[in-house]
Amino acid sequence: MMSSNPFHRINISLVILPSLFLTAYYLFASFPRSPIPPIIHTSLAHLPSSSPSWNIYPENFYNGGAYVNLPLGRARILVRYWLIGPENGRRVVLIHGLSIPAIVWKDVAPVLASRGYRVLLYDLYGRGYSDAPQVTYDTTLFTTQLALLMQHVKWDNAFIVGLSMGGGIAAAFSAHFPHLVNGKVAFVASAGIMESGDISRTAKFMSSPLVQTVTALPPFQHYMRRLANASKPAELQEILRLQSAHLPHYNAAVASSLRDGPIRGLHFAFQELACTSNQVLIIHGTADDTVLYKFASKIRDLVPQADLVTISDGGHDITITHASDVSAALLRFLADNYSYKPAQMSLA
């Protein structure tokens, strides 16, 4: 039977408590190991010269190309960018989308440059000629990448144009770094406010961590390389397949972007944009089956001052299929004498 003597209980406490305290002190008073830099995976730049990618999308696809090492924690990420157009031109940033790198602007960027704009293009982390850090591809990762790149090229601000997921990046960038936006933001076939139900079951399955683990295994990668080298689809489809087959972290980067990135949940960014003096343009095709046309109207509901240019029968790749229409709309919008017109424009 336990003693009811209070002095006995005190003596036991005096023996046990210091021991417990010392144990806890040594267990919890030490810091964990120093943070480990993320693993960095290579880009198209490391493929052999025999790879078809060098013919489709070489490093010098645009003039004025260069690399920069951008900081990410304790790591440095190699990023490819291009500056085209006159050095004293009005500055425009073009942000590509989820899977296709800066080649997607091939029929738009030169038009802007020829009309006197200084255009900055770049490959997002994990795409094209930019390395792929093994991290979560969330919105902050992409907005910070652009802010660091603009700092590197010594741009105080610029007009911001985003395509597809790049539209989500443009919206979040405007919210995170409003001082870097020079009064104009354009969204082309823009994502950013899609809901989980708007993403196909197949896309959700393929972007799951389990599937990504399987597809990273050497046998699957070998199969994808053979498939990519044997097939000759359209230009953009081929660069997509080559990235998927040859870049070790491309599929995981795309999957993480789909799960965690600027595809969904950016209503707040568009709402914040509505509270600024920025002029806003939305360009969207009625036949877009990737980011449905309804999202153009939903974005406009969030940003009432936005102009909406509707491209009749335009799909998701309108910078390729309707490049002249997109270029014309952007040139009108970026001009100094642009003024908002309440009635939407429709391009047949």
Question: Where do the PLM segments sit?
Answer:
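Conserved HGGG/HGGXW glycine-rich cap/lid loop of the alpha/beta-hydrolase fold
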Residues: 73-129
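An N-terminal hydrophobic leader/cap segment in hydrolases
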Residues: 11-70
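Short beta-strand/loop motif that positions the catalytic acidic residue
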Residues: 276, 282-284, 288
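Catalytic active-site module of serine/aspartate enzymes centered on a nucleophile-bearing elbow/loop
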Residues: 3-11, 304-348
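Conserved alpha/beta-hydrolase catalytic His-Asp/Glu region
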Residues: 196-202, 213-276
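Flexible "cap/lid" loop of the alpha/beta hydrolase fold
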Residues: 171-176, 180-215
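Short alpha-helix in the alpha/beta-hydrolase fold that links the catalytic acid
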Residues: 268-270, 292-301
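Active-site loop/oxyanion-hole signature of alpha/beta-hydrolase fold enzymes
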Residues: 59-60, 66-74, 80-82, 114, ...
